[in-house]
């Protein structure tokens, strides 16, 4: 995890330096074009799922997606994916959990708490439902990434090392599926759930705005 954090930090510093040095009157280079495309995609995705008020969460969503995606595909570089450790996925889900209730208190005030007791008979279920949100998000990401890591470990363990060199195309395809394809999907799902859960506490007029954007 430390290696990935350091790599992302260096990349962020390099990107920030390139953006500051860029001349607005000149045509941006390939690197800046890619950065601009990524930022526009994240802003568009955030706005379409969270509405205008959700745009301020774009930085968090972009950082979260990048972090989870890089962690998921780190197996391609011979590293054990940090997201295969529940000690990583749970804090990520807890950050989302805090943002959900921060947003709830901001827009609903005391009503964010009182709605847990409506109706009174369903209060235990409502509380369990709130607690289940970070647990389900963290366990989903942890389980999917861990299963891919275990599968690749079993495959490498079953195939003799002398034969592995001749089966690199097969291992390449498996890594593309378990690391890249599955990793990208899990990062996308985690961020989508984050946006949906945070946005559900926005006022009703914001929900209408999201529908109009879609």
Question: What name fits each language-model region?
Answer:
Residues 1-214:
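Selective transmembrane helix interface/packing segments
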């Amino acid at each position: 995890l430390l290696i990935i954090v350091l790599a992302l930090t260096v990349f962020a510093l390099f990107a920030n330096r390139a953006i500051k040095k860029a001349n607005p009157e000149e045509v941006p280079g390939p690197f800046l074009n890619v950065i601009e495309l990524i930022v526009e995609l994240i802003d568009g995705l955030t706005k379409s799922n969270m509405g205008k008020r959700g745009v301020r969460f774009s930085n968090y969503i972009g950082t979260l997606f990048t972090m989870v995606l890089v962690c998921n595909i780190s197996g391609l570089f011979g590293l054990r994916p940090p997201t295969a450790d529940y000690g990583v996925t749970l804090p990520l889900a807890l950050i989302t959990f805090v943002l959900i209730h921060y947003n709830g208190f901001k827009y609903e005030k005391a009503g964010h708490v009182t709605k847990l007791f409506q109706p009174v008979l369903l209060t235990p279920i409502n509380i369990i439902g709130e607690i289940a949100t970070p647990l389900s998000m963290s366990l989903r990401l942890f389980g999917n990434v861990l299963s891919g890591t275990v599968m690749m470990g079993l495959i490498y363990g079953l195939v003799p090392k002398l034969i592995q060199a001749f089966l690199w195309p097969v291992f390449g395809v498996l890594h593309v599926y378990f690391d890249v394809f599955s990793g990208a999907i899990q990062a996308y799902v985690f961020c989508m759930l984050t946006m949906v859960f945070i946005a559900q506490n926005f006022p009703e007029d914001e929900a209408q705005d999201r529908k109009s954007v879609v």
